[in-house]
């Protein structure tokens, strides 16, 4: 599955997919910030020449500057990606901005272990996002941005 929304006016883009590893064009896009998390099994990644193994319930945030390569996938993982024009240019709070600790706070790859409650919330948010990607009303852009902000806050 792959859901994409693009706002041509501001050149903003947001993507939710469970097949990033099969999409070379999306993998090569150097404008996208990424959240990758494992729903089941484990995923082996190379992130800026650092070997990372993500297991069920783990999430990694990556900036548009990170180089990402999928080495092995055993299970199911998701990626939520967006460019700076979609989210970062909107002057978001420093707690949820693109320039904060989440994306640029360490020289090491940050890995988060999600609690059962956080996993449930992410699952709920991504289901709502999937519905919003299919919507074509005038509020779609803003709704996806609000859902992304909520995802970041989690």
What does each model-identified segment do?
Residues 1-55:
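Generic protein-terminus/edge-of-domain signal
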Residues 2-8, 71-131:
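A hydrophobic/aromatic-rich effector-binding and dimerization subdomain
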Residues 34, 113, 143:
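Amphipathic alpha-helical recognition patches that constitute DNA-binding helices
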Residues 34-36, 79, 150:
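Residues embedded in well-ordered beta-strands
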Residues 44-46, 62, 67-73:
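Short beta-strand His + acidic residue motifs that chelate non-heme Fe in jelly-roll/DSBH
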Residues 51-53, 60, 76-77, 86:
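Short, surface-exposed beta-strand-loop junctions and turns on beta-sheet-rich folds
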Residues 54-67, 81-82:
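Conserved metal-binding segment of the jelly-roll/cupin
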Residues 117-154:
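An amphipathic alpha-helical interaction segment
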């Amino acid at each position: 599955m792959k859901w994409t929304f693009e706002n041509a006016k501001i050149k903003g883009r947001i993507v939710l997919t469970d097949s990033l590893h099969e999409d070379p064009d999306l993998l090569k896009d150097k404008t996208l910030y990424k959240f990758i998390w494992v729903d089941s099994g484990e995923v082996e990644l190379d992130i800026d020449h650092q070997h990372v193994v993500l297991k069920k319930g783990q999430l990694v945030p990556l900036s548009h500057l990170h180089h990402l390569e999928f080495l092995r996938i055993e299970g199911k993982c998701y990626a939520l990606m967006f460019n700076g024009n979609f989210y970062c240019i909107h002057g978001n709070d420093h707690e949820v901005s693109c320039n904060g600790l989440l994306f640029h706070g360490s020289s090491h790859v940050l890995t988060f272990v999600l609690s059962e409650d956080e996993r449930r919330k992410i699952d709920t948010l991504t289901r709502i996002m999937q519905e919003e990607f299919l919507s074509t009303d005038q509020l779609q852009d803003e709704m996806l941005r609000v859902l992304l902000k909520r995802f970041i806050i989690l």
